[in-house]
Amino acid sequence: MKFKKELINILALIFVLKKNIFAQSICPTGYQMTQGSCTAIQCPNGQYYDSNLGLCANCDQACSACNYYPTYCTQCQNGFYLYQNQCLTQCPQAQTYVSCSGSSCICQACDSSCTQCFGNKNTQCLACSVGFYYNQINSSCLKQCEDGYTQQIVNIGASQQLLCIPCDNNCRTCSQTNAQQCLTCKDNMYLNTATNQCVSTCPQLQYKINGICKICPTGCQTCYNTNPSNPSTVESCLSCVSGYFLDIENQLCVKNCVSGYVVDAATQRCLPCNATCKNCSDQTNQGCLQCQNGYSLTSGSPSSCQNNCPNGNYQNSSLCLSCNTACSECFGADNQQCTACKTGYYLYKTQCLVICPVGFYTFARQYADPLKQPICDYCPNEMEQCEQDKSNFDLIKPILCKRGYYLYNGTCVKTCPDQTYYQDEATRSCLPCVFPCQTCLSASVCLTCATYTPNGQVQGQTYIFAQITYNGPQGTVFQQNCVPACPKGFYQNSKNNSCQVCNQQCQTCQGPAQTDCITCQIYDSNNMLFKYNNQCYYTCPSSQNNPMYGDKTTQACLPCSQECSSCFNGNNKSCYSCMNGYFLEYLKPECKSFCASDGTYMNSSTNQCSLCGFGCSSCTNGTFNSCISCLNGYYLQQNYNVCYPCPQQCASCTDMNTCQSCNQGYFLYSQTNSCVQQCPLIGFYVDTTQQACIPCDASCLECYGGANNQCISCPKGSYLKTDGTCQQCSQCSSNNECLGPNITDCLNQPICKPGQYLYDGQCLTCFPYCSTCSGTTYDSCISCQTTTDYTLLFDVCKKKVSQTDTQCDIGFYYDSVNKQCYSCHQNCIQCFGKSSSQCTKCSSGYLLHLDITTCSSTCLDGYYQQDPSIPQCSPCLYNCINGCSSGYQFLLGLCFTQCPFGTTAQKENCSFNSKPSIQFAQNLGNSVNNNSQTISLQLLVYSKNLFSIKWRLFTGNTDISNGPIQSYIQNRFDYIVFPPKSLQSNTQYTIQASILDLANNCQNENDCMVQQTFQTMNAITKGNFNIEINSAYLQLTLIISGWLFNSVPDNISFDLYVKLTGNDYFFFDKGQNYQDGRFTYLIPNLSYDLQDNKAQFFLVIYNDFDVQIQQLLIALNLNLQQTTISIDEFLDSVYSKITTLQQIQSLSYQFYSQMQNLMSSQTTSQTIFNRHLFYQVYSSLKGVQIPCDSNINCSGNGKCLWSQDNYNEILCICNINYAGRYCEFQSYQLDIARQHLIALTDLISNIPLNKSSDLFFTIEVLLELTYFYSIFDEFTLNTLINVYFQVFNQLQRVQSNISDEKILFKISKLTSQLINLINEDQTLSYNDQQSLLMKTMNDFDSQINLYLQNFAKSFDDLKSQEQVQTSFQTDISNINLNLIYQNDLLDAFMSNNGASDGQQQTPIVFYGDQISYTFDITQFSPKSSLSTAVIKWNSNPFLSQSQYQAPFISCITELVIYSQQTEIQISTVSQIVEIAIPKILPTPILSVIRPFYQPYTCIYFDSVSQVYKQDGVQYLRENSTHVICGSEQISGNYGVIVNQEYIDPNLSLTVIWNATQQIYANDQQFINFINQLINSNNNNGTNENPQVSQSSFNPNLSLLYALLIYIIFITIFIVISIIRDRKDQETYIKESDSYWLVHPIYSLIFGPYSSFFPRLQRSINYAQLIINLFLYNAIFVLVYSLPSEQELQQNVGKRQIISIQISSTSVACSIVTYYLTICMVNLFKMKWYIKQKWLDFKQDKITTEIVEQVTKSLKIFHLMNYGLVFMLQAGMGIPIIILILSFNSQQNQFFFTSVFASFVIDNILDIIILISFCFIKIFSQSEKSKIILLFTLRGFYYPVYEFLDIEDKIKEYQQKGEVLPAEEANNQSDDEDIFEINDHMNTPKRIFKKNEEKIDKAQEEIQLNEFVNNLKTNQ
């Protein structure tokens, strides 16, 4: 029966393939035939078009849209991220960042400046592109480093890395070689060019210019530059050093004054001589040594110069001529030759000027000579501009100081006195720091902050110091200010009162840690972080018991809906997985209790609505034979529960022969229940509406409609009338026909006897059994002979049959409705209906088309006759319509350009070979890199009776395979796998494969054998390593030399791992290209972590394994470039060369792309042929009874059978009371095991797979379950297979966190048990993804099994560890290596970690300031090994029977250690050695089931005492086949025993299985754990105590009462709102929609916000309503749920009433209070401000007094308002106090006291918050805001803001006591918003007039004074 079901399923799928391929043969791939034309196939959402099957297949569950194959996603479901056409749960952190649009999120590539990035921005980099500098502080990549950083190029490996190194704190830019050497400085700092340091004040003999301290000229003590914009100009001296004198004219220091100048010893300046002197000894006229022209020197001492001419004249030769008009005395006619000036002029040198030049001042004091006029005297050295004090002529006051000096208190100083002032370069003065800075460097850079005392407070508050850096439009901006509160992203550090930056995940915070967040970052509406426990997460933390999601509204982590076990961000009902009892809808993130009838079923193993089988619309499970109903176009085969496709022309059908509706272009023919392209012409017409063939009226022969007047032709004996009806020939005899109604229209014919009929004027004999007829055929009878047993039915004389007789004669079929036999069509001799398309056997000369049950004389288009001797037509599948075109060979309905493997070309056909065929799929050649490569060789086999394949390996003539490696194959391929290091380098090998065929002359190995020779390459010879380190930047240099490559590609690279163990730091640099030389690595962010007098350890690991992998990838890429490669060769080249999951991931995209290219570029007939060949081999298998052998002996409890239904597999038929795949179990043991398997299956089915920990645990459980796979029933197997596929898919998503070797080992172990079970499901052969998965698993299984087979041959020498200690000073100068080899293959599979810390040497003891560093370079291959040789003793020779009662679980093993292929003896080791001891039998891993118990004890044999001991050896871990023990000493033989607490001490090895089951049976803790998981959804069961249920119900009821009362109050206030609204409209008095403020909720949402009701106050009021509504009920629940005594239980009713009363009263008072507050506001605005005249508006102008009155009024109003609120709410406590006194018991008083206390605290907190807000609001208002508030109270709202922009001018005129001019006010008017006073309403009103009419200019010129007067008038 099972075989029959599978065969039916196979035929159905083949039919679908034929149908689709037939359409594809006409239309291109991706198109289908529709109404005679090819149209593109459109698949529904969540599906893609599978070009191989020609169907729409489902996308992966994570994809919302895909192409090509299920996992090639183009759009992802919510909660997944699209990356390289894959949907991931999170983006790869090092390559992408998250970018969301709507609900679709994509992993976008990093910015072009980054090669790796992280976070939510594309500019948060980990590594930079070429030409960009990396800033480690802010993780950015820049073309040029920012200010404060210097650009450095560091050699790392063979490449160079560009870094931005931080400069010294005061530097803006610094040197590339030394970050402490500044190039430019920050603001208010100056570069000392001598030291390259930035200083705030330049040293002596230097001056400041453009941020630089420049050296003064020679002789200058202080100097400055007169033109800072041109630093190359000459400096000017201010003072001179000793021995030099200041030349004021040239601003230089000279040793001697020039002619006309004299030294002033007091000031060390060169002063000009008297104007009459050319040269002098002092400045007076008495010290002249030489006179000007026209003057003569007087005799005597002192001497002076006298004018030779009268005053106002000068001497010219012998004449006295008049001086210039400005000169009163002169020595020439020019204005430049004056010696004294007239009134109004000042003598400057020898020139008379009206104003003295810059640097001089008017010296007003008169000289002793009254005729002398004032002169222009020099300003003091530090002054650039100065003036003489009018009251004190001796005092010279500076106006502007020279550069480098600053004006302070009337003097020029070089530095300002203290930091409360700052030096302003613009004004060259000392300005006070701007509040709130207490000390500062500039107006915008504070150093410390001032304190301030808000009004009403006693103690002052200090402003917060904030240093903030942000990116502005002009670049990076640095602010150092004092702020009252820290901005977003910063928090206040109370220790130093400064703003410190928050954690980058926090938007606001209260500290620097991740757990100090107040709010979280928001990048955009779809990209934000969520808060949970004061920490921000990209994805909320969830557990199985507490699933959470990120709510985008509150930005918090909230619980998922109760039906979700995990959900997506944004909606608690958008589920990712479901709780037990709920199922995740297909392609919808919703959990439902039932699945919809949309082709899905409830999968309890995954809690999902999984897809039904092929064609099902509803089903019981996902298998093909579990359908309940079918999709359109399919029908249900009831006997097999399978949905089969309807015939191609049918849109719907009930079976293959009964169509219900037809596809476009076909019509339903009811006579045969089939769809035809053309209706019969006789008796039917086409109804296009119904798309069916409708019978004509009975009177018509042919017609075009169903009426009797729509005839086209008539039957014999009638004629066609003009009205379309048929009329009988009434005028003619019964045997005649007529042409019309007259007798003359009759056609006279002879009268025939009975049994004859008239034909062409002659009487001919009827068909036998006919009495009368119309022809000679069987279906032309009119009546039957009465003497025979026949009856007339549909013009045929049929033999009468009984109701129970269904057998008809040949040529007839049985009609079950009419219980009669009817004749077949004339083309058929056997049929099931009347039509020619209902034949099962054809008449002679006709060919049967089996799939469409049609007989025709020749094969129809699309069919061919495969065998000329068989009258049957088969459908063409590919490349043909009817036979093959020229150049093609025909085979099995396919056309080939070349006959496939296993066949031979014979003319135009391909025929199968009679003998088996065998060949290698590829030639290894001489490119095998044996040292690193896993070599896989594929064998192609065609054999109908294939039994096995044997492999041998030779070197020369030596067979080194150690016996043939036998493989039982399952299909036409086989593989041989050579693990790494199994072959020698530079060696020639011969691989030989032979097959055994039981029926075709392949009885021994040499009959059918192929072989090929290949050459291995030379090995890579490793060179020397050396390490150097630079202490400045923690820079490591790796020196590699002496490597040989020998025909290996040069582009070898390696990975570098650097580990700082003292700081737990790990640095990873991957993919460095190899070259001999130096590789430099800069370890980031560690230079400040090194400490003196403390050991620092580094671990540098060289990954030799990656070198080998890259060689494989190079070879693979070369293969991919060969476009002629076949699919099989391509698959083999991929799967034979990958060894880790990372390589699978990296090659996946390339693999699928190449696969698509191959599939589209070459014919797919090969693939179709392979499937046909597979089924041909399958159907030809014969069962053979064979004897059991050593490999399969059925445990001695059964017989061996070579089964035809299991692909040549040898199976066991067990004896009675035995069961299992190999009859290894007894029946009662089987029953016990099955009970636990049910629980375990449920366990793994309910484990979520969204976390790595859950995934690993599931793998462990699955691995254990596979040991018992032979006892699984069908349902359990299906569950395990589904879970297995889930696990495999999840592995691809989390594989970056998986240790590759361990997972590969587990996958292989799991696959080796499940592979045969999966193959039994034939549907998997037609699913490409599952076929691909199975092939991958086959390869894994083959690879690992052969690893283990060749394990003993792959041991390498144990390399002794060399360790050298090097100590040195802090400036590290040298380092050494420690070479550690990797463990063996088995240890890599079994160990928890790779290179453990235990392999590093212990810290070194040292003294002083020496620091020791140790570097280890660990290579991953070749691997050292400790091998254990298994000694199979019949009995334990070392163990007395009385020593250990517990049985041995393992073999007795002997530990043997080799070095240089020589056995060595080692007694002690420096660290624990791990020893893998094989088990006697594979057993489950008990540590998985009971993780907190140790199941085994490791022991060793002490040869001295001759007993086994446990000291010095310990149990570490186990798997199904080995136990790992750790030993501190190497000694003899080892074993493992089972602990007594696990099993019965008397248990023997023969019943080890029974012992294992007993463990399960006795493990009550495990059973309880299973039950808890199974019943996790049933924890809300019935409680035995009904009082608990009642008490939990009552508080909920009280809450409903409170809500009901609250709704009643809302209704009342809505009614009031409507009444108030109408009243306002009737009275024409409506002030700014004040009725909005009646109802609090309506007002909160829609009401205007004013100074009385800002948003914060409304939010507090609304929160108060919620608190009052639920607070008291919460207290009731809390108190009532305490352990209650009898009195508490008796007063439940009273407490309910009280609780409802409290809640209702609280809500009512809150709403009434709010309403009264609104009324007070309206009353206050309309009456108290106007009628009571609290403000005086009678003044002519707005003054500060008005503002003060507004402030005072607001204070009084708010105090009265909140005082009333407090009294109203405090009054609520009176009834509560009365109720307290009415109860006497202590419990009741405690209850009400708690309620009252909570009530009081609630109201006090409300009042404190509101009053505090009132004061803050008032006192924080600016003067402008207070003035605006004044107008707001008068009814003028927002336009006042624009009108009052003249605040500064008002303030200016108020200070002057003036009124603002009208034109100033007019300039501030608004063209669109005009204010006017409406006289008849007595209320100011705002008129909006926008673009409606041209506003009168007079209205635009309203003056401020008129506006104030209007306000006064309206009072």
Swiss-Prot record:
Topology of this chain in the membrane: Multi-pass membrane protein
Glycosylation sites: 138, 274, 279, 316, 409, 496, 572, 603, 621, 742, 909, 930, 1051, 1085, 1193, 1250, 1297, 1519, 1546, 1554, 1580, 1596, 1867
S-S bridge residues: C1188-C1200, C1194-C1212, C1214-C1223
Disruption phenotype: Gene knockout results in impaired in mucocyst discharge. No significant effect on the mucocyst biogenesis.
UniProt cross-references to PROSITE patterns, sorted A to Z: EGF_1, EGF_3
Transmembrane annotation, as ranges: 1599-1619, 1662-1682, 1704-1724, 1763-1783, 1796-1816
Cellular location(s): Membrane
Record keyword Glycoprotein present: yes
Extent of the signal sequence: 1-23
Any one biological process term the GO annotation gives: exocytosis
Entry keywords, A to Z: Disulfide bond, EGF-like domain, Exocytosis, Glycoprotein, Membrane, Repeat, Signal, Transmembrane, Transmembrane helix
Residue span, EGF-like domain: 1184-1224
FU repeats: 53-98, 104-151, 161-208, 210-263, 267-315, 317-362, 373-422, 427-492, 496-546, 554-602, 606-639, 640-686, 690-739, 760-814, 818-865
InterPro entries: EGF-like_dom, Furin_repeat, Growth_fac_rcpt_cys_sf
SMART domains: EGF, Ephrin_rec_like, FU
Superkingdom per UniProt: Eukaryota
Keyword Membrane: yes
Gene Ontology CC terms, in alphabetical order: membrane
Function: Required for mucocyst secretion.
Designated name of the protein: Cysteine repeat modular protein 2
